[in-house]
Amino acid sequence: MTSATAAYRAARDDLLGLRGQQVRAIDEFRWPDVGEQFNWAIDWFDAIARGNNRTALVIEEDGSSTERSFDEMARRSDQVATWLTAHGVAKGDAVLVMLGNQVELWEAMLAIMKLGAVIMPTSTAAGPGDLADRIARGNAGYVLCGPADVPKFADVTGEYIRLAVGAVDGWADLHDAYDLPAERAAHPGTAPGDTLLLYFTSGTTSKPKLVEHTHASYPIGHLSTMYWLGVRPGDVHLNISSPGWAKHAWSCFFAPWIAEATVFLYNYSRFDASALLAQLREREVSSFCAPPTVWRMLIKADLSGGPGALREVVSAGEPLNPEVIEQVRRHWGVTIRDGYGQTETTAQVGNCPDEPVKPGSMGRPLPGVPVVLLDPVTGARAGAGGEGEICLDLSRHPLPLMTGYQGDSQRNDEAMAGGYYHTGDVAALDDEGYLTYIGRTDDVFKASDYKISPFELESVLIEHPAVAEAAVVPAPDPIRLAIPKAYIALAPGREPSEQTAFEILKYAREHLAPYQRVRRVEFFELPKTISGKIRRVELRAQENARRASGTAAEHEYDAE
């Protein structure tokens, strides 16, 4: 066992031992000193995996399953690392990884990490335009995807090497890796501060930001996420999340394997609450994490005869309504615990296991995460009973924080202004240290647990010849919490009609990823400030008031 492994294990075990003692954990926990060299895939995963035949990964789909032990994952990721090396992947190279929930995704992530290369996770929902932008801005020298997504790269230019999980003309086949000797690839050595991950995350007025994480910020920082989840050694952990997004790495990769738990994935083409409940029972899932959209769908199913092994249930991404929490508690005898974090960080705030849960609250700051609330105008710290922007105190060196937005000094200056990292989210603080989420300081919103940037959707909408201006806001929805609705100012000579709405919605559907789908349009003169900026806050308020009163707009049309 290396000194880095020993330090990491000691920190992990400290948090496991402080279960149900969050206040004490906040006071006592210290991030491990792993020294000048640290690689989580080698110093942690391989250390717990070699000779370990317990199940590390289970993927269930269409009645069949694929399983890998910890030892198999260690050996197979070595084979993939050797194969990647043969194709030129070296320390510092960026690899765009666009795979679904399949074993090769986990093996590739471990392998890329072992080589000191950079993982650029990408959703399979991304289209050619998104891919071209990511390859260019992320300086990706390699692309790894499944055969079904290969056609998306046909017109994506760039000097990148094409790698596929399967036989495709002109692309190297990753399956060839498994014919290679299971020997450890040469490890170049990685420092904790070396770049490990590049995530694209949406902003309000520009293209997605490029978030840079290191071999410390996520691999070590997710110790706090493990503490919030409550996952333990030997658990079976299921997280509902799509690959390519940070939450997938949080809860399908780092946190459960930090705890030495089994990662269980359930793939489905269409959500079926009854089928998911059956999997929870059959697989004896003990720890379950799902976005509010899934929880709202689950309570519409028969919750009787709940999963007997289920101990931890958590939700993240957006506030969860109390009725959902109450129904699950009544039927299953467990309480859904909320948490909060960002792509830019690990989990920051959470209701932790064996701690009192306050309805509507997302909990207290997690161990090692220096959360403060600052007044957005004055910058003063908010005390009990106050509210402010959720920030991290940079003077306390928050380890789980990104290095910054790569190649964007202006955004970095804004995000790190005044000695604090600014999340852009506002919360209220009570006298026991619990935080309750209020909303965003900007216009980004979530729909079905996907972060939506109005700017990205509006940029596509205004390409349509009938659209002069567009403003996208969240429209309340009982299942998805919100759906993207577009307020449209029509071009001269165009009249509001069902046919025009259909054409615009069709165009948007063809040019946006499925999760970005605009589901409603209204033809409306956009309210603006004196300087000409669209007042989305006014549109949001109007939307909420209409839905609350059940009032329909004259020129509103649905995509359904």
Segments from the language model and where they lie:
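Conserved pre-ATP/AMP-binding loop-to-beta segment of ANL
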Residues: 53-55, 169, 179-200, 206-207, ...
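ANL superfamily adenylate-forming
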Residues: 62, 142, 148-192, 207, ...
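Conserved AMP-binding A3 loop
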Residues: 66-71, 196-220
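Conserved AMP-binding/adenylation subdomain of ANL enzymes
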Residues: 219-236, 244-286, 301
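AMP-binding/adenylate-forming catalytic domain of the ANL superfamily
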Residues: 512-534, 552-560
